[in-house]
Amino acid sequence: MDKMSKWIVKYRNMILAVAIVLLIPSAIGYFNTNINYDLLSYLPSTSESMKTQKILGDDFNLSSVDFLVVNNKTDQEAAKIKEEINKIDGVEKCIWRDDVLDISVPKQAIPESIQDMLYSGDSTMMIVTFKEPTSSMRTMNAISKIKKYTKDDCYLGGISAISEDTKDQTEHDTPIYAGIAVVLCMIVLFLGLESTIAPVVFMLGMIFPIVYNFGTNVFLGEISYITKALAVVLQLAVTLDYSIFLLHRYQEEKQKLPNEEAMAKAIKATFTSITSSSITTIAGFVALCVMQLTLGRDIGIVMAKGVVLGVLSTIFILPSLLMFFDKTIEKYKHKTILNELHKVPRFVIRHYKKILVAFVLIFIPFGYGQAHTNIYYDLISGMPGDFASIIGTNQLKDKFDMTTTHFVLVDDKLTTNEIQNMCSEIKDLKGIHNVLAYEEFVGPGLASNFTPSVVKDIFQNGGKKLIVVNSDYKAATDKLNTQLDKMDTIIHKYDKKGMIGGEGSMTRDLITTTNTDFAMVNVLSVIMIFIIVALTFKSFALPVILVLTIEFAITINMGIPFFTGTTLPFIASMVIGTIQLGATVDYAILMTTRFKEELSHGKKVKEAALIAMEKSSVSIMTSGFSFFAACIGVSFVAKMDLIKSLVILLARGALISVVSILLVLPSLLIFCHKFIEKTTKNWPESNMEAKGE
């Protein structure tokens, strides 16, 4: 690394020039990366609901379905609206009553079940199907055009419409999130660093890995809107301490060496230090990639890539910036507020046993709270009430009793009698509002100019028959999941291969999938961190102690919502623990490394712990408070509950982690020092008492 460090310093201006040029293709990549706003599309393709969605898309042209509520319009005006919607690119078909019965015929001639579905007082409903899935930009653009055309007393409801509103909100909010995170991180850096200019230089340096990370996402094809919204905040919070370490080491080396030699030494020391800590952070994000819900892979890859790019930028690009602004950095200085702690370390040394007792007593109730925190899977409930799509979805519920729509697929070889009997049994289930099948359109008593052949194309394709079932229950509730289970039983009585699609079925699969993912990701992330720490320190005891300390912080963080009565979004329980584990392990490694270093210098156990706490405290607090500031700032402006909940948990987790590392970790290091000595290769032997005790 000596030669590499000297090469970086020698060619620093050329490296910076190349880095600036690389921003151009990265920016192009960013603007060409698709964003997925449909979280349900991340379900495994092997799940029944996703298989059903594929058939609905391939055979029935129902890749994406929304419902348009048209208020206070005549049938003639409604027909005109439908005609214009059908002209919009991306719309497969807008389906209304005139597809099967001319509007000159009184609506009373329509079967009662169809009347109930299409009319409610002065309102009527149209079914809008799209050529491509919900997450497609073509579908998003089509929805945007529909909303612009029908803005007068018409509301589009459904998952696709909600996704389009989410897109608009995210595109508006993401730059604001980034701006707030940068400003608040800089404020924390001003409090913790003597140099007034260094925080600005750090932010200039962070531009490179952030832009590179977003630009290289183009190779993934697409990323989720959650990843897009949080990536800047997380990358800033997780990798900023690498920059701080390089600056501190450079300033230290400058006291005894010329600037270029000092920077070369600083680069080498920084690379050695941040490589081990960054690997643990990367491992935490990589653990997300094993999730069946591929949203985890999406977040995991982007954030792991962001950490790698953060390390590379710190080693290759930041040295050039620090040396370019060197005189300015040294010239403008101010008094810091975040200084080394002295009273807290002494308190820990005196009361470490009491701290550990408190640690156990706190862990138990919060562990219970974490296991019993309420989780919501309903993607609609976390959206702002002023979204046009939410207003439309609520109107579907209030006016047409269409809270959730199920799409049932059965073999087209089933007889009319079997279909009617099956529909009758489904209608009798509690919470079913109505059932619509092709068989409703055929039979005696219908108008002579009724055209069932048009309807047949909608309800029968690809060897399957489609049955539409409207439920009074909300998706992701126990009532709806029980209803789906009973529907499965009825359907499979007539067709063993019968399937149910739609939001309700997909959300049921989401619950099943995430329950498995949650346990798997947590276990894997702990194992990966354990192995890396064990290899780093060549120890068995230290990974146990470090992971236990961090899991304590995670348990407190995830247990608090139980006691406050807060319901968390499903994604929080899967990703927060992993992110907090990956970010916090850096602090733990920093303090443990300093503890070992002081022991190797002949210090007693308590004295070594005291010095480790004092010398590590500023770095830990600056990094942790930066993480907190970046996330808490976003929470004040985030309108979507899913984003807001995630950043609040991350912000609170950062503070809890700082406290845990400063209080619990040194207490465990002191208490377990003999265990550490016996299970760690080349660990310095030492007695307990500090000098003067």
What do these predicted ranges mean?
Residues 1-35, 134-377, 492-693:
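Membrane-embedded transmembrane helical bundles of large multi-pass transporters/channels
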Residues 44-66, 70-163, 374-542, 548-567, ...:
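Structured non-transmembrane domains adjacent to transmembrane bundles in polytopic membrane proteins
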